[in-house]
């Protein structure tokens, strides 16, 4: 399959749907998208899309997987291409030998996993397509630790509803990149914290040492440079309160299912 497939950005699709098929597809920078009433329409469309997606797809349904011959020769490194902090640079310099992933929040037994331990755990390999909201896509091969194993090891609370991923890259003063998913996606068999890409160690530009792969959602949900995983029952307490950097800063959909 070619990696040149173009997908319609979901915000434009939802805008068109919310306007009753009038054919009016507005760019994200259009002044109308700043109107509170219009934003409410978009949020309603997002909720409808999420509900339809859950109804149509079984909670365990897999995203399409591909063959080795489908792997894209070029996989664009989008967004940050470095963690951007002195602490992260030090981890890169010593090849993450002293780095560890923290699992905490609403868990019974908070855990720390170093990279060697993560690589020694049961892993999953998958060749999947990364679909960017900008309209490009690429196919890559990923191997990593299933997120559900880490949450189970930490004893996830029955009161937890969301999993938040705290990342090393900074997108402004006091604004590190972060993302979140619900428990359906957190426990999905294809949701992994990837430490390998295309049979090699995950490159820095693609999010080393760990990158979230949540294969049934758009690219901005695939958080890079994951440093900490936190279980919570409420997303409103984090930064702008919408569950992710792009959601907070640019009103992207929190649920980006495809």
Residue ranges and their predicted role:
Residues 1-8, 19-23, 27:
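N-terminal secretory signal peptides
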Residues 11-12:
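N-terminal Sec-pathway targeting helices
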Residues 19, 109, 156-157:
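Short, well-ordered coil loops that connect the C-terminus of an alpha-helix to the N-terminus
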Residues 20-24, 139, 154, 219:
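Generic hydrophobic alpha-helical segments
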Residues 30-153, 224-226, 232-258:
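Near-N-terminal "mature-domain entry" segment
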Residues 125-128, 145-258:
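Mature-region segments of soluble proteins
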């Amino acid at each position: 399959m070619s990696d040149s497939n173009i997908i319609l950005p979901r915000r434009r699709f939802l805008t068109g749907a919310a306007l009753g098929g009038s054919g009016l597809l507005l760019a994200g920078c259009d002044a109308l998208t700043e109107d509170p009433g219009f934003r409410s329409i978009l949020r309603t469309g997002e909720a409808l899309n999420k509900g339809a997606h859950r109804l149509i797809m079984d909670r365990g349904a897999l995203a399409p997987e591909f063959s080795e011959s489908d792997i894209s020769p070029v996989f664009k490194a989008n967004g940050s291409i470095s963690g951007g902090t002195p602490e992260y640079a030090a981890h890169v310099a010593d090849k993450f030998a002293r780095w560890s992933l923290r699992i905490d929040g609403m868990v019974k037994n908070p855990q720390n996993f170093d990279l060697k331990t993560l690589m020694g755990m049961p892993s999953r390999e998958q060749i999947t397509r990364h679909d960017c909201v900008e309209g490009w896509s690429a196919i890559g091969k990923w191997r990593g630790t299933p997120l559900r194993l880490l949450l189970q090891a930490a004893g996830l609370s029955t009161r937890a509803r969301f999993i938040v991923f705290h990342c090393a890259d900074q997108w402004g003063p006091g604004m590190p990149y972060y993302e979140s998913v619900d428990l359906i996606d957190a426990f999905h068999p294809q949701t992994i914290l990837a430490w390998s890409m295309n049979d090699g160690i995950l490159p820095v530009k693609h999010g080393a040492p760990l990158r979230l792969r949540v294969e049934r959602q758009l690219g901005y949900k695939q958080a890079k440079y994951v440093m900490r995983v936190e279980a919570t029952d409420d997303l409103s307490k984090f930064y702008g309160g919408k569950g992710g950097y792009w959601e907070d800063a640019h009103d992207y959909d929190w649920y980006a299912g495809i």
